[in-house]
C-alpha cells in the first residue's frame, strides 16, 4: 500500500530544530511517527523583478495613507505566491499540503490537494497587538482581513493552538465549526518523566523569568513585584534567563542568553526549570508561548497575564495566576503572597500544572489529534 505523502510547507528544512523555536520540528517529528511520508515544500518567494513591483506598491500605499503597509500579507504578494505554490506542489506530487502560518500563499491557491493550515492566532487578532502588526493604513488592514478570511475559507482544515484563536475564527470570520480544530502545542525540550520534587531551603522561593524580550514580556513588572515581597521580608530570588536588564541586586541572577540548540546551554535551562518554584512572565502580548508548556511539564505554577491565548496554558487559581493586563506590581505581589503564606497551595498548583501538561500540553497529544484530522480527510 502506497504511503500517504504530506507536503510540509516551511521556511527551513524540516530537520532544523530552530524553526519557529523548534515547533516546526516537533510537528514534523509527530507526523513521521504515524507512518506518513513527509516532504519539505520550501517557501516560495518573489523574484527580483516582482520584489521591485511590490516595493513600488508598498511605497505608494505609505505615501497615500501616510501609514504603514503590511509587508507580510497583502494582495500583490498573495496573488503571486499562491500561483508559485501551486506550481511547487504540482511538481512534488503530494497527497496533503500542511502549510503553517501561510496566510498569503493559501488565499488564492487553486488545487484539488487537501490543505491543512495552522497558526497560533488569527492575524486579525494581532493587528495593533504585536508591534510588527501595528500602524497599518485602513486599506492595508482591510486587505489583511480579507485575505485571511479567504485563506480560512479555502483550506480544508484550520488548526489553532488556543481557544482564543478558535473562537475568533468562528465568530468573526464565520468559519464552520467542523473546519476549525484546537490542537495545543507541547514542550520543545525534554521534560522529566515524573513530577520533580522541590524543596524550599531556608525559606527561599525561586522565581524564573525565561524570555528574550524584556519589554514585551514585562520583566520590569516581575522585578518590581518581587521587590515588594522582598521588602516585606520574604526570601525570594529572581533568575532572569534570556535578557540582560540593568539590575544590580544580590537576590537577582541574570543569565543573558542560553541557546537551546547547544546541549550545555539546554541543560542549564532544564536545571533552572527543575530548581525554580515559579515561572513568572507577566507578558504584555502573546499567543501561546511554548515556554508555558515546558514549565507545566516541569510542574511549575505559572504567573502571567490574561491576554491573547495565554489562558490556553494557564488556569487561573488552578495551575497558576493570571491577572488582567492592567494589574500592577502590587496586585501581583498580593496574589503571590497568598501562596507564600500557604505553601501547600504551591504544591497543589504544581501538581495541577503537571497534570495539564500530561493531558493537554504535550506533542504526543498533538500528534494523535493531527493523525485523526488526516484520517478524516482521507475518508472523505
Segments and roles (model prediction):
Residues 301-305, 314, 322:
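Short hydrophobic beta-strand element within catalytic cores of glycosyltransferases
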Residues 316-317, 321-329, 338-343:
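Conserved acidic donor-binding segment of nucleotide-sugar-dependent glycosyltransferases
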Residues 164, 186:
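Carbohydrate-associated surface elements
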Residues 196-217, 222-227, 238:
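Conserved donor-binding/catalytic core segment of Leloir-type glycosyltransferases
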Residues 242-278:
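Nucleotide-activated donor-binding/catalytic signature segment of Leloir-type glycosyltransferases, i.e.
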Residues 338, 345-360, 366-372:
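A short, well-ordered alpha-helix in the C-terminal region of glycosyltransferases
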Residues 64-68, 111-149:
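Acceptor-binding helix/loop patch of EC 2.4 sugar-transfer enzymes
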Residues 284:
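Aromatic "clamp/platform" in nucleotide-sugar-dependent glycosyltransferases that forms part
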Amino acid at each position: 500500500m502506497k504511503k500517504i505523502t504530506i507536503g510540509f510547507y516551511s521556511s527551513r528544512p524540516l530537520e532544523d530544530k530552530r524553526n519557529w523555536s523548534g515547533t516546526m520540528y516537533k510537528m514534523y517529528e509527530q507526523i513521521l511517527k504515524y507512518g506518513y511520508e513527509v516532504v519539505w515544500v520550501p517557501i516560495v518567494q518573489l523574484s527580483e523583478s516582482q520584489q521591485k513591483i511590490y516595493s513600488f506598491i508598498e511605497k505608494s500605499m505609505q505615501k497615500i495613507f501616510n501609514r504603514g503597509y503590511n509587508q507580510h500579507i497583502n494582495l500583490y504578494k498573495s496573488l503571486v505566491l499562491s500561483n508559485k505554490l501551486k506550481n511547487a506542489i504540482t511538481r512534488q506530487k503530494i497527497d496533503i499540503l500542511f502549510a503553517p502560518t501561510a496566510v498569503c500563499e493559501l488565499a488564492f491557491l487553486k488545487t484539488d490537494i487537501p490543505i491543512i493550515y495552522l497558526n497560533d492566532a488569527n492575524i486579525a487578532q494581532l493587528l495593533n497587538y504585536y508591534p510588527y502588526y501595528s500602524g497599518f493604513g485602513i486599506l492595508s488592514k482591510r486587505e489583511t482581513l480579507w485575505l485571511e478570511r479567504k485563506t480560512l475559507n479555502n483550506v480544508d482544515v484550520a488548526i489553532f493552538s488556543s481557544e482564543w484563536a478558535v473562537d475568533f475564527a468562528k465568530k468573526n470570520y464565520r468559519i464552520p465549526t467542523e473546519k476549525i480544530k484546537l490542537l495545543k502545542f507541547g514542550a520543545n525540550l525534554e521534560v522529566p518523566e515524573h513530577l520533580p520534587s522541590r524543596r524550599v531551603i531556608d525559606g527561599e522561593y525561586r522565581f524564573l523569568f525565561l524570555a528574550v524580550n524584556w519589554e514585551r514580556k514585562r520583566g520590569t513588572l516581575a522585578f518590581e513585584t518581587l521587590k515588594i515581597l522582598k521588602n516585606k521580608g520574604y526570601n525570594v530570588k529572581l533568575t532572569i534567563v534570556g535578557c540582560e536588564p540593568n539590575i544590580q541586586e544580590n537576590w537577582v541572577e541574570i543569565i543573558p542568553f542560553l541557546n537551546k540548540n547547544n546541549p550545555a546551554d539546554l541543560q542549564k535551562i532544564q536545571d533552572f526549570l527543575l530548581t525554580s518554584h515559579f515561572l513568572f512572565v507577566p507578558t504584555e502580548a502573546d499567543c501561546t508561548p511554548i515556554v508555558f508548556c515546558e514549565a507545566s511539564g516541569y510542574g511549575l505554577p505559572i504567573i502571567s497575564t490574561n491576554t491573547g491565548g495565554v489562558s490556553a496554558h494557564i488556569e487561573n487559581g488552578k495551575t497558576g495566576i493570571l491577572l488582567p493586563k492592567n494589574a500592577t506590581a502590587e496586585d501581583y505581589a498580593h496574589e503571590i503572597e497568598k501562596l507564600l503564606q500557604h505553601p501547600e497551595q504551591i504544591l497543589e498548583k504544581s501538581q495541577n500544572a503537571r497534570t495539564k501538561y500530561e493531558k493537554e500540553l504535550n506533542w504526543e497529544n498533538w500528534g494523535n489529534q493531527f493523525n485523526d484530522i488526516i484520517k478524516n480527510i482521507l475518508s472523505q
